[in-house]
Amino acid sequence: MALLPLAGATGLSACDPSRVYENNVDLKSPSGDAYVWDVQQRPSFTFAIADTAARYDVYFNVRNASGYGFYNLFLKHTLTGPDGRPAGPALLHQMVLMDPKTGEPRGAGAGDIFDHQFLALPGQHFAKAGTYKLTLEQYMRQNQLPGIMAVGVRVAKVGGK
């Protein structure tokens, strides 16, 4: 229920021939508090790559409440290949969710909820066919991060074919 607008956007993209994978997960603290991203919670997303000649754009989806206490979100991703080994270095990403000067929310909003899609890995080449796992980790300076409602991953073939 918490992912209705983001899920709706995902449903609309079902006709998108470039989309290889998209999934989003709701976040909650270990004690069950909704919309809290705990530093120990590392959502993983598993997707299959068949065409190793193609390039792929990898996006990170973020849903936040307007009460989120920062203008940005740092997260680190780890990509694991079909052989279970790292498929490149773990990278740190900064996503700007609100204007740093005005505090005005960015992204698509409905009420006090805002959805963002950030191009994190443009033109990614996957060297081996098979199943990949992408793990996200919040990299802010507090263990409990209230106001981040959901995160997700989208993988799309560059050129839409």
Segments (PLM) and residue ranges:
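Post-signal peptide N-terminal segment of mature Sec-exported envelope proteins
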Residues: 23-44
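Edge beta-strands of jelly-roll/beta-sandwich modules across compartments, strongly enriched
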Residues: 141-153
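Short tyrosine-centred short linear motifs in exposed loops/low-complexity segments
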Residues: 53-56, 118-120, 124-138
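Short coil-to-beta strand junction motifs in C2/discoidin
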Residues: 69-75, 147-149
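C-terminal motif of bacterial Sec signal peptides marking the signal peptidase cleavage site
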Residues: 11-14
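A beta-strand/beta-hairpin structural motif
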Residues: 41, 93-98, 105-121
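Short beta-strand-plus-loop segments that form exposed binding edges in beta-rich domains
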Residues: 61-63, 136-142
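Bacterial signal peptide processing site
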Residues: 16-19
